[in-house]
Swiss-Prot record:
Gene it is expressed from: rpmB
InterPro entries cross-referenced by the UniProt entry: Bacterial_rp_bL28, Ribosomal_bL28, Ribosomal_bL28/bL31-like_sf, Ribosomal_bL28_bact-type, Ribosomal_bL28_sf
Organism encoding this protein: Oleidesulfovibrio alaskensis (strain ATCC BAA-1058 / DSM 17464 / G20)
Lineage, highest ranks first: Bacteria, Pseudomonadati, Thermodesulfobacteriota, Desulfovibrionia, Desulfovibrionales
Any one GO molecular function term: structural constituent of ribosome
NCBIfam families per UniProt: L28
Any single biological process term in GO: translation
Protein name as it appears in the record: Large ribosomal subunit protein bL28
Length: 69
């Protein structure tokens, strides 16, 4: 799924560019999506496309990094 948050479903919205002379042309407002590694409840790690609001709210469970000696 491109350009859509995999947690909240946020996707592009439509609006207008408005010039100084008040001419309106269509445009799209894109969500701020980032790719992040997410640990599933089964323990698998998956790269997901999520919005920054979901990242900050803690909806994405980051995988634990194993340190090697």
């Amino acid at each position: 799924m491109g350009k859509q948050c995999e947690f909240c479903g946020k996707k592009p919205q439509t609006g207008n560019n408005v010039s100084h002379s008040n001419i309106k042309t269509k445009r799209r407002f894109m969500p701020n999506l980032q790719s992040a590694r997410h640990q599933l409840p089964t323990g698998q790690i998956k790269t997901v496309s999520v919005c920054t609001r979901c990242l900050r709210s803690g909806a994405v469970v980051k995988p634990v990094v194993k340190k090697t000696a």
